[in-house]
Amino acid sequence: MRAAESGADARVRPVDRVEPADAPAGDAGGLRAAVPGDGGSAVRPGDARLDVLVPPGLVDEPAAGALPGGGQRAPGAGRADGGDVRPVGGRDADGAPRFDQPVPPGGYLWWYVDAVSDDGRHGLTFIAFVGSVFSPYYAWAGGPKADRADPENHCALNIALYGDAGKRWTMTERGRRWMRRSRDEFVIGPSRLHWDGESLLVEFDEVGVPIPRRVKGRVRVWPKALCRFVTSLDSGGRHRWGPIAPCSRIEVELDSPRVRWSGHAYLDSNEGDEPIDRPFREWDWSRATMADSSTAVIYDVRQKRDGDRVIAERFLLDGSTESFEAPPRQPLPTTLWRIGRTMRTEPGVPALVEQTLEDTPFYARSMVRSGLLGEVVTSVHETMLLPRVITLPVRLMLPWRMPRRA
């Protein structure tokens, strides 16, 4: 976002859109102020357009009012057929974050925030997990198929700070007795996420590893609009993603390291009914803030057995969305851990890695310059290589970065 709107002036507007169900086929430089937003889009195998898939029964029904055929819906919970409605996408019916959504054994649900300061000198990401998908403890607890473990016994808040104040990273997994979830709040040990009806507050007091440096403070995310866009990432509809507040402002107050800043932010959620490595081989995801302060997202998913699924969506400031055709893939330089990244960019605008923020055996986060929708943009970009997550060497390394407090 480039306008410096004050969070107090934000007015949250829910957008009542969930994609319909259908059966699909088959490094240099610092942080840039022009960092992306994020969204979701039409799903395509390769580049052919497909309707987005949301599994039946997972979508919240409309509020009280007229029903097809002339009937009326009474206020309150439940479907027209008398059944229960399961929350989907880590959000409530109005699009606001909802933290008490059920998660099946072996499954996961996470809320993701990234942000960059207006001056481009600072950045951060937060990921709050129910069912810590990359955790070796969660996988080992789930038995031979890693699908029997209790997700609420494996929760974590991942914090990554970048920029002038130095780089810090924490991700301590905590057991059920350290966790509490309600509709508006998610508590993980000494940290919590809280939705107050207008903004998302994240308060945290964590310690990094292997160097034990404290990360303490609070941030507040002010959505410009709430979005109910949810789409499936896999052909079976067991893994879903959607932005909650793709165009937001953020206020950051850190006690350790001591720094204050404000900027533009993005909030989304991912969820799955099974371990994340089941259907996917890899994905590249990117979000960019456009010249009009809208957010464009490309989710480029490669499945193990079915075709590619490409989601390309532009999220406008009023909460509405516009699908677009993703430009061609371009290979990026491999990381130190030999992850082969790609970026979608328009012909004539070579993709350029401006900075690699995270370089791990299975995941890379970068700032990438590319051409998108007729503009030159800098995106927050990630590459995930799922087969590496389940290898024994990686699982034996992860406890050094992800300790557990049961």
From Swiss-Prot:
Keyword Cell membrane among UniProt keywords: yes
GO biological process, one term: photosynthesis
Temperature effects on activity: Optimum temperature is 30 degrees Celsius. Enzyme activity is significantly lower at 20 degrees Celsius and 40 degrees Celsius.
pH dependence of activity: Optimum pH is 8. No activity is detected at pH 4.0-5.0. At higher pH values, it shows rapid decrease in activity, although 50% of the relative activity is still detected at pH 9.0. It retains much residual activity after 30 minutes incubation at pH 4.0-8.0, indicating that CrtC is stable in both slightly alkaline and acid environments.
UniProt biased composition (Low complexity): 21-34
Pathway assignment: Carotenoid biosynthesis; spheroidene biosynthesis
Major localisation: membrane
Disulfide bridges in this chain: none
Single annotated GO MF: hydro-lyase activity
Region entry Disordered, spans: 1-48, 61-101
Similarity-based family: Belongs to the CrtC hydratase family.
Protein name in UniProt: Acyclic carotenoid 1,2-hydratase
Gene this chain is encoded by: crtC
